[in-house]
């Protein structure tokens, strides 16, 4: 779950 959240942040950035 944590990994998914990080990927979204990077994608958003």
Curated annotation (Swiss-Prot):
Chief location category: secreted
GO cellular component, one term: extracellular region
Domain of life: Eukaryota
Cellular location(s): Secreted
Keywords: Secreted
Tissue-specificity statement: Expressed by the venom gland.
Name of the protein this chain belongs to: Venom peptide Ocy3
Organism name: Opisthacanthus cayaporum
């Amino acid at each position: 779950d944590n990994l998914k959240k990080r990927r979204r942040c990077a994608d958003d950035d």
